[in-house]
Every structure is written in C-alpha cells, then in structure tokens.
Amino acid sequence: MFLLLPFDSLIVNLLGISLTVLFTLLLVFIIVPAIFGVSFGIRKLYMKTLLKIFAWATLRMERGAKERNHQLYKPYTNGIIAKDPTSLEEEIKEIRRSGSSKALDKTPEFELSDIFYFCRKGMETIMDDEVTKRFSAEELESWNLLSRTNYNFQYISLRLTILWGLGVLIRYCFLLPLRIALAFTGIGLLVVGTTMVGYLPNGRFKEFLSKHVHLMCYRICVRALTAIITYHNRKNRPRNGGICVANHTSPIDVIILASDGYYAMVGQVHGGLMGVIQRAMVKACPHVWFERSEVKDRHLVAKRLTEHVQDKSKLPILIFPEGTCINNTSVMMFKKGSFEIGATVYPVAIKYDPQFGDAFWNSSKYGMVTYLLRMMTSWAIVCSVWYLPPMTREKDEDAVQFANRVKSAIARQGGLVDLLWDGGLKREKVKDTFKEEQQKLYSKMIVGNHEDRSRS
C-alpha cells in the first residue's frame, strides 16, 4: 500500500474541498435557477463587462494602426460592389443609350452591346454574389478577442496581447470545463428524466412532468453555452395544433426556442448518442421522427405532419423550412412542404449577436464536435427571439406564396436580407432552370418588343 505524505494529503484535501465548492456553486447559481427559470443577472453583467473590454481593445487597435499609418481592416458588410435594384430591361436600355442614340423600342432584335450586360453581371457574381457569402461566417466590425474572428490581426501592443492571452486562459481553462459539465448534466437529466416520465400512463400529469423536464434540461443546456436570450412578444408563442417556423442558423436554434416553449420536434432518426436522446424523448412527448428511408417520401412526411396538427391536443411542431444553416445575415427560400398542411403558422425570427461568438454552423467545414467546441470556447451566445403574430394561408394563395409571405415577415423583423435563393445551393450545383430563367427574360424582352412593332 502507498502511504500519503502530509504534503500530498494536504493537496488531496484541498483538491476535494475545491471540487466540493465548485459543484456547490454550480448547483446554487446555475442548475437550481435553470430548473425554476430564474436568473441572478450574472450573465448580463458578464455581457456588459465584455462590451467595455471590446470597446477598449478596438480603441487600442485604432490608435496602434494610426501610429503605424496603417488602415484598420473593416469588412464590407453590404458587399464590395454597389448594386442598384434595376431590371434587366432597364440596364440594357442604359447600355444601348450610352452606345448610341437609339431607344430600345426602335432597336432590332439584338445588339452586340447587349453582351456587355451579361459579361458585367457574370463578373459581379464571381466577385460578390448574394448566395455564397451566406454560407461562411459573418465578418465583424471590430475584434472580439477571439483569434478566429479576426482576419487581419497583427501585434498592436503588449497590453492587448496580454489581454488576449488572459481571455484564452479564461475561456479554455475555466469556461470550457464548466460548460462541458453543464452540458453533460443537461443531456444526462434529459435522457433519464424523459425515460422515467415515459413509463407513466398517458394523461395530464405525464404531460405536465414531460413539459417541465424538457424545459429544465434545455435551460441547463442554454447555460452550458452562456446563452443570453431576449424574448419579445411572448403573447404570440406557438400553441397546440400549430406549426412554429423559424430562420435557421445553428443546431442550437432548437435549444434557444425549446428553453422558452414546449415543442414537438421533427427530424430523422439517428444512431449513437443522438439516437439515445431521441428514443428517450419520444417516450415522454409525441415527437415526429422519420427513418432514413421515409425522409425522401414527401407524401408520407406530409401525411404524418398533417395527422399531428389535426390533433389540437398535440404540441406545436418546430420546423426550420430553409433546410440548412445560414449565417444569420439573411433568410433563404422556405421549402413549401410545411405550408401545404393548412395549419396555423407561428413565425419566429432569431437574430444572433456575432460580437460574443459566431453561432453559425458551417457544416461543410466543421463537424458537430468541432462546432460545439467552438461554441463552448466562445465568450457567450447572445441572441434575440421575436414571436410574430400567427399567420394562415389565404384563399387565393398557394403554398409557395404563403411560404414567401412568412419568410418576408421573419426577415423584416430580424433585420435580415430576404433572398429567394434555395439554401440547397450550399451543397448542390446551380440548376439549369436558373440559367434558363435569365435567357427567358432576355428573349421575352426582345421577342416581345418585336411582336409589338409587328402588330402596330
């Protein structure tokens, strides 16, 4: 047997006391408040302190750049090309006017100068298109002391470098272990709690317990990300028998919304840890999980969703119609499937503040584990959530028009760019129909004018 020396025994005792104090503080200041949905204001104080530090760091960088006669890097938030919203016909008219005095309606079917319009548009798209930049992290106006968010960082001063190093120590040596412990606590309680609730007979008591177990666990997971969330217009929160649709930036969108409401999730059945969580959750709550073979069957998916929303006693379904993660600067095309069902739609706009950490998941660049590690080593996740008034499909409106109307409302409320492009372009090639659409517009302009002249 090994005998501990007095000094070694002292170290072991101190370590034991430290861990006891740490877990007591964790329980009192984080887990218990999460269970009851209360906050002591520590996270908001932390956020205000960070803002002051960021402001000071930005001033130091600007001063250092001025002393060295260097221009401080500023991202082009509105794109590198100034674009006016004009139609194809108007732009070609302008090109023809600048080349000759002929007007469009007196011009033959085709002019060689028309080529310049398509060449210019092609060059603009290569340099700064609307779609590709939505699939990469949003650039910041000022550095937030995270090396991965600063694309042009150079040594400025000793104090700023020390501050950055201190930030690395705090994030990796204190916040990361704390957040991992909270994440395991939240996930563990979710699996155990929902499994136990699943054995209870169906009824109000089971529903009550299931709701509070879900809320408790999601709130603990929210604290594992140091998420500071502001909810607006809670009177518009989704109700039973409806569909909640939101813009999609990250997998944590689910946790953000589920920590303030009780939803039925929709998704594909997974294996591993995710599969264990899914099987436990579905025992306590009627979530809608699909097998891999069923996901591609659009009619089967629509049928399952319709059956769910027709039962007004069932929870609102949470759906992200974009189908992929966008970098929270815009909202892209909504898939029409969830708008064909005929249920009341509850739009929700989610807007993250990238100053404290980039919530966007670039799935083509980072795996889930790497992404979660980046989240847990960020300063915090700060976001605003707006619950919009419920919307229903109008009589003269098809599913696509309804989806676009909901999308526009979300984009307007969240201060996001409303785009018609499909988020599927993140992984797929541009369809020929997009190219043909431009050809049709041009041919319609030429042939249309020619036919009008023939009739006259």
Curated annotation (Swiss-Prot):
It catalyses: sn-glycerol 3-phosphate + an acyl-CoA = a 1-acyl-sn-glycero-3-phosphate + CoA; dodecanoyl-CoA + sn-glycerol 3-phosphate = 1-dodecanoyl-sn-glycerol 3-phosphate + CoA; sn-glycerol 3-phosphate + hexadecanoyl-CoA = 1-hexadecanoyl-sn-glycero-3-phosphate + CoA; sn-glycerol 3-phosphate + octadecanoyl-CoA = 1-octadecanoyl-sn-glycero-3-phosphate + CoA. The keyword Transferase applies. Glycans are attached at residues 247, 327-328, 362. It is a multi-pass membrane protein. GO terms for cellular component: endoplasmic reticulum; endoplasmic reticulum membrane. It is found in: Endoplasmic reticulum membrane. GO terms for biological process: acyl-CoA metabolic process; CDP-diacylglycerol biosynthetic process; diacylglycerol metabolic process; fatty acid metabolic process; glandular epithelial cell maturation; lactation; lipid biosynthetic process; mammary gland development. Residues 1-37 form the signal peptide. Keywords: Acyltransferase, Endoplasmic reticulum, Glycoprotein, Lipid biosynthesis, Lipid metabolism, Membrane, Phospholipid biosynthesis, Phospholipid metabolism, Signal, Transferase, Transmembrane, Transmembrane helix. Its EC number is 2.3.1.15. It is an enzyme of class 2 (transferase). Pathway: Phospholipid metabolism; CDP-diacylglycerol biosynthesis; CDP-diacylglycerol from sn-glycerol 3-phosphate: step 1/3. A motif (HXXXXD motif) lies at residues 248-253. The chain crosses the membrane at residues 156-176, 180-200. InterPro entries: LPCAT1-like, Plipid/glycerol_acylTrfase. It comes from the Eukaryota. Highly expressed in testis. GO terms for molecular function: glycerol-3-phosphate O-acyltransferase activity. Belongs to the 1-acyl-sn-glycerol-3-phosphate acyltransferase family. PANTHER family: GLYCEROL-3-PHOSPHATE ACYLTRANSFERASE 4 (PTHR23063:SF37), PHOSPHOLIPID ACYLTRANSFERASE (PTHR23063). The HXXXXD motif is essential for acyltransferase activity and may constitute the binding site for the phosphate moiety of the glycerol-3-phosphate. Converts glycerol-3-phosphate to 1-acyl-sn-glycerol-3-phosphate (lysophosphatidic acid or LPA) by incorporating an acyl moiety at the sn-1 position of the glycerol backbone. Active against both saturated and unsaturated long-chain fatty acyl-CoAs. Protects cells against lipotoxicity. This is Glycerol-3-phosphate acyltransferase 4.
